[in-house]
A protein has these predicted regions:
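Conserved short alpha-helical segments that host acidic/polar catalytic motifs at enzyme active sites
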Residues: 1-250, 254, 266-300, 338, ...
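Structural motif
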Residues: 68, 96, 300-302, 348, ...
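Glycine-rich oxoanion-binding loops at beta->alpha junctions
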Residues: 71-84, 279-292, 316-352, 499-515
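Glycine-rich, anion-gripping cofactor-binding loops and their flanking helix/strand elements
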Residues: 183-205, 334-368, 507-543, 573-587, ...
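Active-site phosphate/pyrophosphate-binding segments
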Residues: 264-268, 272-302, 392-521, 594-614
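Glycine-rich phosphate-binding loops that contact phosphosugars or nucleotide phosphates
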Residues: 293-438, 442-445, 525-566, 589
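Generic C-terminus detector
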Residues: 548, 561-563, 573-614
Length: 614
């Protein structure tokens, strides 16, 4: 959520800032704003409710000159979406401007203290409290901006990524972070600042990922300086980031989401590259090689995740338990961190997050560390916080995912969990050789079978028009298909705003069957596997109650075709790999229904791509 961009250098800052905000639109937001220091030392703050395009329209006749500036997209946490509550916020004197991602937990206490000292506030936000606090300290003690920020952060409780400019010190930007990401791009006599690498990569591939507790000082013509609140200088690694600008463009597709759905065959190929050797019939994960003892000695594995990543975790649980014979628990990270879990050094904790910045998952990792657990991270964003906080892990290597509703990250996570389960099972000797070889071979064929499945796009597009009337959907699956049903329901909810629920098919008769009537479409994942006959019975029960059945079936299934209203035939694969195939039609169905309803599929309302606050 919330996107931060900053620039200081020889260029005009405004175009850089606007383009950066556009690159961060995928994170979700309800308002946007910018603050610029012009060549005469004037500070100009412009902000508005709505999109970045609305901000550009608002600024069309404004003074947007200057080579120093910050900009922000806001997703409301304190105070309703409005131009007043939008960032940047400025101090009472109008000398300072700040942008902020995160939550200041003790803002109410700080605000009360400042009000008692005579300060007034324009907005309802926690962010304005912080900029007023910085200026109060600055004026009371006659300090420079850096020292004032350091003292202010001493008093702050919470998570934050902030950037400040001061028109009295116009040649610098101060940035700081705690439990919220910030990246600095180092150019030629210039610095770029952002929440992630996407706004920066067009200008430089040299980047510094700030660690928790860091305060960065960016001054034109000087080296990057990083200190802590006690003004102790910190070592800051500057790394070269391998990310191409073309990877974050739409590439001719109408939406990022559709582009990312169609990228999945290539993404899964990239995910498996160097990890699966079909000729040698072998799976190699460096993390398993390097940390074999810690992983194989685990008495239990806890997987923590949120949203779509949690659904991937459920599939990983079945893979690991089936083939490694290690008990696995899957928990929402938000619940795990607060329920006093019984964990110890005998446990391995797997943390899954596309962005690597999910606040609850990061907090769960911190808790696991306190209990001496061995921690394995599965992430997409290279250099993000979770990989830096874990003992080892695997990147999914699916490239930037811009659409808020996750698609290719889900299949990437499932692929890595499958590789992990196979590698561990092989090392433990808990999988039969013929089973291992057959799964490895079939896994190598998944990208081609994904391509086959994507050829159903036109069919699913036509199908979606039939069901735009629906107010509710039910998704059913069993075994490995149950998490796919959950994920399909989530996708529909996220982008079409249609209520949808995913259930194990066997649980239908324990409640959901009461909802089924002629207005209730039911999506059933009914491929040929050990529970095929039982799922067939579920379909017959739905039809007996006049429900509309959309069935995902194995190719050539005539039996279900006779009774289902709509049938989508899928390429055959092994049961444990079916989620990688079956999820694609559900992604397409959600996408096309949302498009038919005129929804913004890339930026659905109230959602954020990277949830960096609780």
């Amino acid at each position: 959520m919330c996107g931060i961009v900053g620039y200081i250098g020889d260029k005009e800052a405004y175009p850089v800032l606007i383009k950066g905000l556009e690159r961060l639109e995928y994170r979700g937001y309800d308002s946007a704003g910018t603050a610029l220091i012009d060549d005469n030392g004037g500070l100009h703050v412009y902000k508005t409710k709505g999109k970045v395009a609305d901000l550009q329209h608002y600024c069309a006749d404004k003074d947007v000159t200057g080579c120093v500036g910050i900009a922000h997209t806001r997703w409301a946490t304190h105070g309703e979406p409005s131009s007043v509550n939008a960032h940047p916020h400025y101090s009472e004197s109008g000398n300072l401007a700040i942008i902020h991602n995160g939550i200041i937990e003790n803002y109410a206490d700080l605000k009360k203290k400042l009000q008692e000292k005579g300060l007034t506030f324009r907005s309802d936000t926690d962010t304005e409290v912080l900029v007023q606090l910085v200026e109060y300290i600055q004026q009371k003690k006659h300090l420079d901006l850096l020292t004032s920020v350091q003292l202010a952060l001493h008093e702050v409780i919470g998570a934050y990524a902030i950037a400040l400019i001061d028109k009295r010190e116009p040649h610098q930007i101060i940035a700081a972070c705690r439990q919220s990401p910030l990246v600095i791009g180092v150019g030629n006599n210039e610095f770029f600042l952002a929440s992630d690498a996407s706004p920066i990569i067009e200008y430089t591939d040299k980047m510094a990922y700030l660690e928790d507790g860091s305060i960065a000082v960016m001054k034109q013509g000087e080296e990057l300086k990083v200190v802590d609140v006690l003004n102790r200088e910190l070592f800051q690694k500057i790394q070269t980031v391998d990310l191409e600008l073309g990877q974050i463009e739409k590439g001719g597709y109408p939406h990022f989401m559709l582009k990312e759905i169609f990228e999945q065959p290539e993404c899964i190929t990239n995910c498996m590259r160097g990890r699966i050797n079909v000729e040698a019939t072998n799976v190699t994960l460096s993390a398993v090689i390097d940390y074999k003892r810690q992983l194989l000695s685990a008495k239990r594995i806890n997987i923590v995740a949120c949203g779509t990543s949690w659904h991937a975790a459920l599939i990983g649980k079945q893979m690991i338990e089936s083939y490694c014979r290690i008990p696995v628990e899957v928990e929402y990270a938000s619940e795990f961190r607060y329920r006093r879990p019984v964990i110890s050094s005998d446990d391995v904790v797997i943390a899954i997050s596309q962005s690597g910045e999910t606040a609850d998952t990061l907090a769960a990792v911190k808790l696991a560390k306190q209990h001496n657990c061995f921690i394995y991270g599965i992430c997409n964003a290279i250099g993000s916080s979770i990989p830096r906080a874990t003992d080892t892990g695997s990147y999914i290597h699916v490239g930037p995912e811009i659409g808020v509703a996750s698609t290719k990250a889900f299949t990437g996570q499932v692929t890595v969990l499958t590789l992990l389960a196979l590698a561990l099972a092989k090392e433990k000797g808990t999988i039969k050789e013929e089973t291992y070889l057959s799964i490895v071979k079939e896994l190598s064929l998944i990208p081609e079978k994904m391509k086959e499945t994507l050829q159903l796009n036109d069919r699913i597009c036509a199908l979606s028009r039939i069901f735009t009337y629906a107010k509710n959907f039910l998704y059913l699956g069993r075994g490995f298909s149950y998490p796919v049903a959950l994920e399909g329901a989530l996708k529909l909810k996220e982008i079409s705003y249609i209520h949808a629920e995913g259930y194990p098919a066997a649980e239908m008769k324990h409640g959901p069957i009461a909802l089924i009537d002629s207005d209730m479409p039911v999506v059933v994942i009914a491929t040929r596997n050990a529970m095929y006959e039982k799922v067939l019975n579920n379909i017959q029960e739905i039809k007996a109650r006049k429900g509309k059945v959309i069935a995902l079936v194995s190719r050539g299934d005539d039996e279900i075709s006779k009774i289902a209203d709509e049938v989508i035939e899928l390429p055959d694969t092994q049961e444990c790999l079916e989620p990688l195939i079956a999820t694609i039609p559900l992604q397409l169905l959600a996408y096309h229904i949302a498009v038919c309803k005129g929804k913004n599929v890339d930026q659905p309302r109230n959602l954020a791509k990277s949830v960096t606050v609780e």
